[in-house]
Regions:
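Sec-exported extracytoplasmic/periplasmic mature domains
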Residues: 12-19, 47, 51-55, 80-88, ...
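Nucleotide donor/acceptor-binding cores
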Residues: 18-26
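Conserved acidic residues
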Residues: 24, 91-92, 138
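Hydrophobic alpha-helical
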Residues: 45-46, 61-131
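Short beta-strand/turn micro-motifs composed of small residues
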Residues: 27-30, 121-123
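Hinge/cleft segment of the Venus flytrap/periplasmic-binding protein
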Residues: 144-169
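Short beta-strand elements at the ligand-binding edges of bilobed clamshell
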Residues: 1-16, 29-32, 37, 134-146
Length: 169
């Protein structure tokens, strides 16, 4: 699964959450430990695809924020502050890792914002799947590790037989 495919998967989820008219505020939230070149590419792929998919009268304001997670509870504090200051809440919140997803889930419940913010989580744990079942989180995106393993083996076999491997695995 590459950044293009991940971006398309996120776009598919976000497209159904856009306001019919007016501007939809979308925030991509990650931590310094999960922020990579790959997450940047996913963000730009979503931005590009949403621009082409939006309908007349729809506007999208896409932003990203990376929480410095070098100290304990930095992520929790940032998410809490965001929910306490309700004016800064986006319409759609896209979580780019499991820690952010679980913090946002807890804040939605703690600050009575369930239904006010649509949330796309990342990964699948019992907590996240339970939140989706309850309708607190809209959806989650997770990588299929079996598929990643198969692609890795294919890339390794190609490298061993040809001396190089393509970048599409």
């Amino acid at each position: 699964l590459n950044s293009y495919e991940m971006g398309s998967a996120y776009t598919d989820q976000i497209a159904g959450m856009l306001n019919e008219k007016g501007t939809t505020q979308i925030l991509f939230l990650s931590t310094s430990s999960s922020k990579t070149q790959e997450t940047n590419l996913v963000y730009y792929q979503v931005k590009k695809e949403l621009e082409s998919r939006k309908k007349t009268g729809q506007s999208v304001n896409l932003s990203e924020y990376c929480v410095d997670s070098s100290a304990d509870f930095d992520t929790e504090e940032f998410v809490r502050d965001m929910f306490v200051n309700e004016e800064s809440l986006p319409d759609v919140l896209v979580c780019m890792d499991e820690v952010v997803t679980e913090c946002v889930y807890q804040a939605l419940v703690d600050y009575n914002q369930v239904g006010n913010v649509k949330v796309i989580g990342y990964y699948y744990s019992d907590v996240i799947l339970n939140a989706i079942d309850k309708g607190i989180l809209s959806s989650t995106i997770a990588m299929d590790m079996d598929e990643v393993g198969k692609y890795s083996v294919n890339a390794l076999e190609e490298y061993l037989s040809l001396g190089h491997s393509n970048g599409y695995y």
